[in-house]
């Protein structure tokens, strides 16, 4: 009997060794790595690696689980297929009916019908269908801003007296970058320091943000995400993108503060300097929703509404073509943190929603990939770069075209 056991072990050993040689990596959802928000059942992908030549996939199995409970909600079973990119999860829509974070993993079988080990887990999130209940907020409504409507404002059209007069009549508040803040109370964050009052613990907190034209989102003074131009621009009459963030670890027990820095972007092109066109879909506007799920199954939601306040930011001019002006004297230290006195800030107004359909941004963000230090500064010749006395103002307008690669002559 002992001999038979050893023989069986020796026969199985090659299969175990081969299975360990197969590695599953580069897990993607809709061709993207990392957290992705999807509107329906996702299409998943992976790469199979093996040191053995000729190794190929003959079947796969996908498992999807709730990220914060670990409960399995869908399993494909063993599917005979060599497909490993944009693999549909047919039938999962019956199980994926809540806007939760889901984790998934996959294993494959090779040409000898030997299974690999399960891959590491990756995550995706089902888009919320409740964002429409939030209000779009900002400093001024489109009606009060007197912003011209239409897409004809470019080239020679802008030189017409009636067009110039229309743009000059725009309320200056509609052109400004603003800071928005909202304080709220919550229970304890994931882990220790349980809320003595409610005893509830947070298992998941997700923020949905759409700030047009561009925004920067912070929670308790810390920037959330690594995007520099969020959301990605679009034809705002057709589609409007929002971003999703997992902020479970950033929430604190007790009081929290949401901060949003809002600018014009392509949504509200103002001109005034170099520009290719001048068009506005409305003044800067914000839609925000933070959903907090507790361990006991309850949840609470913080939305953009009249409870928010705003003030002008230190960015005194901003245009996607003409750059920005920054006045550091207007900085308000701690404006997006707990304890800041916002009594002088003004209440927001509810604005008209953009015409486009609200959709999750599924494309990768624009972000800083690498930073470079200054290596050397060289004066090209003996010319005087700028002649000016103290406190004299000189203005250099940015441009997309460099006409002189040496010095700027003023």
What function would you assign to each model-found segment?
Residues 126-150, 280-291, 300-302, 368-372:
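Low-complexity, Pro/Ser/Thr- and charge-rich linker/hinge segments at domain boundaries
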Residues 46, 81, 85-88, 101-105, ...:
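Accessory beta-strand-rich segments of carbohydrate-active enzymes
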Residues 20-52, 125-127:
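Pro/Thr/Ser/Gly-rich low-complexity, intrinsically disordered linker/stalk tracts
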Residues 6-14:
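Sec-dependent N-terminal signal peptides
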Residues 146-154, 300-401:
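Activation corresponds to long, low-complexity, non-globular regions
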Residues 40-44, 203-205, 399-401:
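Structural beta-strand segments of beta-rich domains
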Residues 56-101, 111-117, 136-141:
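Recognizes extended acidic, P/S/T-rich segments that occur
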Residues 408-410:
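Conserved small/polar residues in nucleotide/adenosyl-binding loops
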